[in-house]
């Protein structure tokens, strides 16, 4: 049981929180460059630093099986991005036939170059934060926690989905399906950078498409 203490504390402190910026169901939320910058500096970066400190305190990157970004990350990234887009598009289409199901908050795209630049940095840092914990950290520690690969994927996906519950039922479903995909790709290719880059680019594309 003690092997679950650190992951649970990390999850509770870093992810299991009530978002103070989440709007009511269906409400539009304007992009704030200042608020996003504050979130990057005071939340994303310190959270990433904590996760990696705990990981590197035990093993080196090489021992964890993680290398610097390279060609080996291209295949998982190329597999993840279109699959994430397909999941998002399918849910978007299906949700239109179930108007009685409440929708999540609508996050509006940035309006200028500076704001878009901040958004890109935010998407990259957020993707690396989520992939570092939900895929790299949890799945790498599955043996220590006595979990089979399949059960580890379920645990990782469940925790990841709960963090997106503020996006409504469809956002929760999107996170669940995407979480399963990213978890299996990480287990198959052991590529943190591949899935993180696909995750980040997907989030940027969602904003870009909403601006069209």
Feature map (PLM): residue ranges:
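Juxtamembrane helix-loop-helix connectors linking adjacent transmembrane helices
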Residues: 25-37, 59-126
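Alpha-helical transmembrane segments of polytopic integral membrane proteins
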Residues: 18, 48-51, 58, 87, ...
């Amino acid at each position: 049981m003690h092997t679950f203490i650190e992951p649970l504390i990390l999850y509770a402190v870093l992810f299991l929180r009530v978002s103070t910026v989440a709007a009511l169901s269906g409400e539009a939320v304007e992009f704030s460059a200042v608020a996003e910058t504050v979130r990057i500096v005071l939340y994303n970066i310190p959270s990433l630093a904590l996760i990696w400190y705990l990981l590197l305190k035990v093993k080196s990157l090489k021992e964890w099986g993680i290398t610097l970004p390279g060609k080996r990350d291209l295949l998982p990234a190329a597999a993840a991005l279109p699959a994430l887009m397909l999941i998002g598009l399918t849910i978007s289409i299906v949700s239109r036939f179930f108007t009685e199901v409440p929708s999540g908050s609508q996050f509006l795209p940035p309006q200028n170059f500076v704001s878009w630049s901040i958004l890109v940095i935010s998407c990259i840092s957020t993707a690396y934060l989520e992939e570092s914990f939900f895929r790299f950290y949890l799945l790498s520690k599955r043996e220590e926690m006595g979990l089979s690969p399949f059960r580890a994927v379920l645990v990782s996906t469940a925790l990841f989905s709960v963090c997106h519950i503020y996006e409504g039922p469809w956002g929760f479903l999107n996170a669940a399906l995407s979480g399963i995909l990213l978890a299996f790709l990480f287990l198959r290719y052991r590529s943190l950078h591949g899935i993180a880059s696909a995750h980040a680019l997907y989030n940027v594309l969602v904003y870009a498409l909403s601006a069209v």
